[in-house]
Amino acid sequence: MGTVSSRRSWWPLPLPLLLLLLLGLAGARAQEDEDGDYEELVLALRSEEDGLADAPEHGATATFHRCAKDPWRLPGTYVVVLKEETHRSQSERTARRLQAQAARRGYLTKILHVFHHLLPGFLVKMSGDLLELALKLPHVDYIEEDSSVFAQSIPWNLERITPARYRADEYQPPKGGSLVEVYLLDTSIQSDHREIEGRVMVTDFESVPEEDGTRFHRQASKCDSHGTHLAGVVSGRDAGVAKGAGLRSLRVLNCQGKGTVSGTLIGLEFIRKSQLVQPVGPLVVLLPLAGGYSRVFNAACQRLARAGVVLVTAAGNFRDDACLYSPASAPEVITVGATNAQDQPVTLGTLGTNFGRCVDLFAPGEDIIGASSDCSTCFVSRSGTSQAAAHVAGIAAMMLSAEPELTLAELRQRLIHFSAKDVINEAWFPEDQRVLTPNLVAALPPSTHRAGWQLFCRTVWSAHSGPTRMATAVVRCAPDEELLSCSSFSRSGKRRGERIEAQGGKRVCRAHNAFGGEGVYAIARCCLLPQVNCSVHTAPPAGASMGTRVHCHQQGHVLTGCSSHWEVEDLGTHKPPVLRPRGQPNQCVGHREASIHASCCHAPGLECKVKEHGIPAPQEQVIVACEDGWTLTGCNALPGTSHVLGAYAVDNTCVVRSRDVSTTGSTSEEAMAAVAICCRSRHLVQASQELQ
């Protein structure tokens, strides 16, 4: 209570008297506080005196965020993020205004960093009592409390990522990553280790917290261990993936492998500033760390990705949903889980690799041999998703050296396309995460691959919707990708379908929950296709016995996907859209009470066909796959049982799931079928023929 009364005693003082008092305190506390704190505050008061005296109070429209894991929180330090359209000069003005208004209330604040190149905002050290004041400042979008991030580490690996037709000791991919620069945000690095000597430039950037505990001894080998090992995995002379890649080191983790979100943000801004001052070729940023979900961390990654930087991060070692952590949950980041030599998920004591829809793929992450900081010729074995992410960063460097013009979306699609598929035992994952987690282990592409005209597609799952009847789930593709089809999935089977709609100038896939349902997922099929032009044609409920029909009526447009949604709770059978391979392949047909949507696209050389596989009686799963040379763009269930849970694409296979038939009382008349729409570019066929 004494503190509160002392603060209030400052409040009625005239401003000149307050300035004198602050200057006096500055002299008295010169030994306790950093130089300039009080002078900075006085300048802020002087510059804002006229403007703030009569400033109106603003309603609190900004939001406050903090880490969901209490032990990782760092109260007292906050990232203040301004609105997207705010001019960069407003960052410093808003910081000064906050300091001045805080001083008028008897609080001291310290501006630790002003962001100019990464995002509009600043980092401030202040009392939590000032949050309400800060949230009301003009231009403020949101404020996030700082939190901790941690290193994620607790030669079969090189053989695993090498294409099967080669052996690790004889295959040397083209250029070895020499055209790419990799930034590593980690601990410090022993740059004179024989594995990485001459390959690593240690920058002067350092933003790390103090080590925990007064007895911690900062041995060089401890401070350098994590970063040195990962640098060796990325570009080591003997054990590295991309042996020709150059690497720059930024220190954001202390000797205990611990850092902060704010320190990492400043590191990312350092990279962005360097990119602006001296543009170079392709950049890969390796973030082998994880913290709790952070809106500002994810936003910073998004901005850097939009600037053309490829970011690769560890999924995390918490045997948990990767979407609960940052930067793993950022859609613009390539998130990597860890597998062992048998292609199984890595277990680390009671924990292990993270999983879920936010993971893009897995890579070797157990017992990885790499450079040790114990001596300049020592090696050590380490495990974790940090090591897995380092492998993918190396593979990305190799791919970008071979094709420097690749965008982030193109690189991600290639990483997925060339991965080893369906090799992970999904039983290791929690049951509700198995369908969401990609069964992919990273691999280098063959040296002779030609992907210029290939149609690449990937499946993107939404977050789970709420359980209310009107709840919806929404998923979107990356900026450079095209949404070619939309489907939905509900574990309870109670859903009201899905549709493609426009949102913010971008097409999204929206799925609808039903009354009594437990929630629904929206599933997008996101593809890369040059010069593509797509539209959605919708037919409202027909009310006729023949059902609702819609087709692609524009010349040159082909059907890439069908979807349907309905307002009534139970249509019985014939819920999903119907596609008939015979007669009219560009037509979708559905229940008479449902709206039917056809996704129709035009691109040079694009051709599509429909494949169907049905069974006379319901089973838990029905699949149909596209042939080699064709790419799955659409996946749906044909009319049949009302017990269908939904349909989704796994690589090039369409999967239709239903509830356990042993408990649903199904009859033999209730048939079900999986329908795939398979597309290809004729340019690819022609190019293949020319090579033969």
From Swiss-Prot:
Keywords, alphabetical: Apoptosis, Autocatalytic cleavage, Calcium, Cholesterol metabolism, Cytoplasm, Disulfide bond, Endoplasmic reticulum, Endosome, Glycoprotein, Golgi apparatus, Hydrolase, Lipid metabolism, Lysosome, Phosphoprotein, Protease, Secreted, Serine protease, Signal, Steroid metabolism, Sterol metabolism, Sulfation, Zymogen
Region C-terminal domain: start-end pairs: 450-692
Residue ranges of every copy of the Peptidase S8 domain listed in the record: 155-444
Modified residues (Phosphoserine): 47, 688
Gene Ontology molecular-function annotations: apolipoprotein binding; low-density lipoprotein particle binding; serine-type endopeptidase activity; very-low-density lipoprotein particle binding
Enzyme Commission numbers on file: 3.4.21.-
Enzyme class per UniProt: hydrolase
Family matches, as Pfam families: Inhibitor_I9, PCSK9_C1, PCSK9_C2, PCSK9_C3, Peptidase_S8
Site note Cleavage, residues: 152-153, 218-219
Posttranslational modification: Cleavage by furin and PCSK5 generates a truncated inactive protein that is unable to induce LDLR degradation. Undergoes autocatalytic cleavage in the endoplasmic reticulum to release the propeptide from the N-terminus and the cleavage of the propeptide is strictly required for its maturation and activation. The cleaved propeptide however remains associated with the catalytic domain through non-covalent interactions, preventing potential substrates from accessing its active site. As a result, it is secreted from cells as a propeptide-containing, enzymatically inactive protein.
GO biological processes: apoptotic process; cholesterol metabolic process; low-density lipoprotein particle receptor catabolic process; proteolysis; regulation of neuron apoptotic process
Domain Inhibitor I9: 77-149
Localization per Swiss-Prot or TrEMBL: Cytoplasm; Secreted; Endosome; Lysosome
Signal peptide: 1-30
Positions annotated with a glycan in the UniProt record: 533
Prosequence residues removed at maturation: 31-152
GO cellular component, one term: Golgi apparatus
Principal localisation: cytoplasm
Domain of life: Eukaryota
Documented activity regulation: Its proteolytic activity is autoinhibited by the non-covalent binding of the propeptide to the catalytic domain. Inhibited by EGTA.
Domain-level remarks: The C-terminal domain (CRD) is essential for the LDLR-binding and degrading activities. The catalytic domain is responsible for mediating its self-association.
Function of the protein: Crucial player in the regulation of plasma cholesterol homeostasis. Binds to low-density lipid receptor family members: low density lipoprotein receptor (LDLR), very low density lipoprotein receptor (VLDLR), apolipoprotein E receptor (LRP1/APOER) and apolipoprotein receptor 2 (LRP8/APOER2), and promotes their degradation in intracellular acidic compartments. Acts via a non-proteolytic mechanism to enhance the degradation of the hepatic LDLR through a clathrin LDLRAP1/ARH-mediated pathway.
Similarity section: Belongs to the peptidase S8 family.
The protein's assembly and partners: Monomer. Can self-associate to form dimers and higher multimers which may have increased LDLR degrading activity. The precursor protein but not the mature protein may form multimers. Interacts with APOB, VLDLR, LRP8/APOER2 and BACE1. The full-length immature form (pro-PCSK9) interacts with SCNN1A, SCNN1B and SCNN1G. The pro-PCSK9 form (via C-terminal domain) interacts with LDLR. Interacts (via the C-terminal domain) with ANXA2 (via repeat Annexin 1); the interaction inhibits the degradation of LDLR.
Official protein name in the record: Proprotein convertase subtilisin/kexin type 9
Organism: Colobus guereza (Mantled guereza)
